[in-house]
Swiss-Prot record:
Example of a GO MF term: serine-type endopeptidase activity
NCBIfam families: clpP, PRK00277.1, PRK12553.1
Gene name tied to this protein: clpP
Known catalytic reactions: Hydrolysis of proteins to small peptides in the presence of ATP and magnesium. alpha-casein is the usual test substrate. In the absence of ATP, only oligopeptides shorter than five residues are hydrolyzed (such as succinyl-Leu-Tyr-|-NHMec, and Leu-Tyr-Leu-|-Tyr-Trp, in which cleavage of the -Tyr-|-Leu- and -Tyr-|-Trp bonds also occurs)
Species this chain originates from: Citrifermentans bemidjiense (strain ATCC BAA-1014 / DSM 16622 / JCM 12645 / Bem)
Pfam families: CLP_protease
Protein name per the record: ATP-dependent Clp protease proteolytic subunit
Main location: cytoplasm
Origin superkingdom: Bacteria
C-alpha cells in the first residue's frame, strides 16, 4: 500500500511527512487492520512518544480493525492504561474482537463511534496442534484469557460478567447506537459533532 505524503510550508521551507507521521503531530494514532505484535509495537511506541511529549494532553486512537492476536491487543491496552495521557478511542468502519475491546478501554466519556461503524465482540479464538498434554495446557490458557477479557469488558461497559460471557459466546454485532447502549462507547460522532452522550 502506498502511504500518502503531506507537504507543509514552514518558516524554514518545505517539510514532508508520511500521512501517519503528520497525524501523530496532532496526537492522532490510526490502528487500521489486524492486530499482531508488529502493529502493537508501532501503536505502543506512538503512545509512549506522545506521553513523553505531553502527559496531560489527550491522545486520539482511531480504530478500524477486525481484531487480532489477544496478547498483542493486551499489550496496547495495558499501555493505554499505563500512561497518564487520556486516550480517546474512535471507531471508524469497524472495531471487532480485540478492536472492540480496545475501543471500550478508552478514557470514560471519550469513547466514540462514527454513525455507520459496526462493533463486534466474541470470545478469544485459538488453535494449537501437538501432543494432548500441550493442547490441554493451551486450552486452559485460552479459557483463562476468556475470563480475563470478560471481566475487563464488564468493567468498562458496566454490564455484568455473566451477561458479557453469554454475549461473547458467539459473534455479537452491534451498531454504534447499540454499542452505546451496551456501554462500549459513550457517544456517536457526526461531522465532528457528538450525539447521544456527554461532551
Amino acid at each position: 500500500m502506498l502511504v500518502p505524503i503531506v507537504v507543509e510550508q514552514t518558516g524554514r521551507g518545505e517539510r514532508s511527512y508520511d500521512i501517519y507521521s503528520r497525524l501523530l503531530k496532532d496526537r492522532i494514532i490510526f490502528l487500521g487492520g489486524g492486530i499482531d505484535d508488529n502493529v502493537a509495537n508501532l501503536v505502543i511506541a506512538q503512545l509512549l512518544f506522545l506521553e513523553a511529549e505531553d502527559p496531560d494532553k489527550d491522545i486520539h486512537l482511531y480504530i478500524n480493525s477486525p481484531g487480532g492476536v489477544v496478547t498483542a491487543g493486551m499489550a496496547i491496552y495495558d499501555t493505554m492504561r499505563y500512561i497518564k495521557a487520556p486516550v480517546s478511542t474512535i471507531c471508524v468502519g469497524q472495531a471487532a474482537s480485540m478492536g472492540a475491546f480496545l475501543l471500550s478501554g478508552g478514557e470514560k466519556g471519550k469513547r466514540y463511534s462514527l454513525v455507520n461503524s459496526r462493533i463486534m465482540i466474541h470470545q478469544p479464538l485459538g488453535g494449537f496442534q501437538g501432543q494432548a498434554t500441550d493442547i490441554h495446557i493451551h486450552a486452559k490458557e485460552i479459557l483463562r484469557m476468556k475470563d480475563q477479557l470478560n471481566a475487563l469488558l464488564a468493567e468498562h461497559t458496566g454490564q455484568s460478567v455473566e451477561k458479557v460471557a453469554a454475549d461473547t459466546e458467539r459473534d455479537y454485532f452491534m451498531s454504534g447506537e447499540e454499542a452505546k447502549n451496551y456501554g462500549i462507547i459513550d457517544a456517536i460522532v457526526t461531522r465532528n459533532v457528538v450525539t447521544g452522550g456527554a461532551n
